[in-house]
Amino acid sequence: MHFGHHRSAALSAAVVLASAMGITLGASGANAQELTGTLKKIKETGEITIGYRDASVPFSYLDGDQKPVGYAFEICKKIAEAVKTNLKLTKLEVKLNPVTSATRIPLIANGTVDLECGSTTNNVDRQKQVAFTNTHFLTATRYVAKKSAKLDTIEDLKGKTVVSTSGTTNIRQINEANTARSLGLTILPAKDHAEAFLMVETGRAAAFVMDDVLLASLAASSKEPGAYAISTEALSKPEPYGIMLRKDDAPFKAVVDEATAKLYKSPEGKVLYETWFTKPIPPRGINLSLPMSDPMKKAFESPSDSADPAAY
């Protein structure tokens, strides 16, 4: 498969073999005259466009050579392989298009980008504008604290000073938990994630409440990564991340869903997760040390595109 602008030199060796995907659009196969929507466009142009993020570690970001890498980016490359096989193409050019939080939905909706590979939350509001494939990650609100403090559960935080970033759902959640569970917390707002983590680092707060994957990245990037622990207990239900594609394009979604379901249920899916969340990653070799949670294991064993946290 050929990569377009900002292309990676070669596909990862771990790319799912086309034959392993075994995807068809029905008994008669994907003949050109039967195709509609995105599949028709890809067949006619010989191109698929992947949207990537520049700094959504470890999902989709630029490495030291300014090339897109990441967990979600690898999944999108595997989807592209499945599409190539399904359409019986000898060559498929993968074009790479940068997206941001602001541009990702419009660029999917207007046809510029076919797959958005990042850390996009699948929720009901977004489903009115775009579609999502099977969930590839679940985040939840947790807290990071120094291991030496032994703050293993939310109850252990009683009477402590904690910090969260102002204007986030996370600070609202810790305020609600404080009231509901009579924790007697002092809750400080920080202007951004870096300031909040620094408050834990310097002892001005016992814990920082935020999305667990962001906490993992901050801890891994700190001066002493081994000095911090992220709570196993969560303050929120799991929030699913999914790869976006165009709404109301059932044939394309069927190919994408089958490709991701096969990947997630296979041993390779687990290896892919572990590569990006439990091992050193480029460019600085940080290790997020975020093993697969029980809800995440369930999301891989029974793939779902549901936006409902209760589904996980």
Regions found by a protein language model. Name each.
Residues 77, 88-156, 297-307:
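Acidic, polar ligand-binding/catalytic clefts
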Residues 33, 170-179, 183-187, 226-228, ...:
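Ligand-binding clefts/hinges and TM-proximal coupling segments of bilobed small-molecule sensing domains
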Residues 32-36, 41-115:
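Extracytoplasmic small-molecule ligand-binding "clamshell" domains
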Residues 49, 54-58, 68-85, 121, ...:
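Bilobed "Venus flytrap"/periplasmic-binding protein-like clamshell domains
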Residues 103, 117-128, 173-180, 199-202, ...:
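A ligand-binding cleft/hinge motif common to bilobed small-molecule-binding domains
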